[in-house]
């Protein structure tokens, strides 16, 4: 699963159900006949934690990682990220007063403006 081209793309990147969906999973599972459902769940949790940890490490690491979304509610994903990122405090955004459920609305404008240099406004043409 980790050989999917998405994981080789450079940051910043984002994705969701438009790419990682039942069709994607079916293609992956066809390569591994007879896999048990609990092994699928464990593999997806590990894939999530590993891909996040790798990107954090490629960016130079961090002292604290704030997690939101479905992964923040998954104890296995949170535990694995903590293990894969020694020295990094892995927390949920809710612990800092920002509801993980509201993050998508807050994230989208930030994603649009992230590439803008400080003190420089870029106007659409």
Swiss-Prot record:
GO terms for molecular function: ATP binding; phosphotransferase activity, alcohol group as acceptor. Gene3D superfamilies: 3.30.420.40. GO terms for biological process: amino sugar metabolic process; peptidoglycan turnover. SUPFAM superfamilies: Actin-like ATPase domain (SSF53067). It comes from the Bacteria. Belongs to the anhydro-N-acetylmuramic acid kinase family. This is Uncharacterized anhydro-N-acetylmuramic acid kinase-like protein. It comes from Yersinia enterocolitica.
């Amino acid at each position: 699963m980790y050989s999917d081209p998405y994981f080789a793309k450079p940051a910043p990147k984002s994705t969701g159900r438009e790419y990682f969906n039942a069709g994607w999973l079916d293609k992956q599972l066809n390569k591994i006949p007879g896999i048990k459902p609990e092994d699928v769940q464990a593999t997806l949790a590990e894939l999530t934690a590993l891909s996040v940890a790798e990107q954090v490490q490629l960016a130079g690491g961090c002292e604290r990682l704030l997690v939101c979304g479905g992964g923040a509610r998954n104890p296995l994903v949170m535990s694995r990220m903590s293990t894969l990122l020694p020295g990094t405090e892995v927390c949920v955004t809710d612990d800092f007063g920002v509801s993980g459920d509201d993050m998508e609305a807050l994230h989208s404008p930030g994603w649009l403006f992230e590439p803008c240099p400080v003190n420089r406004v870029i106007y659409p043409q």
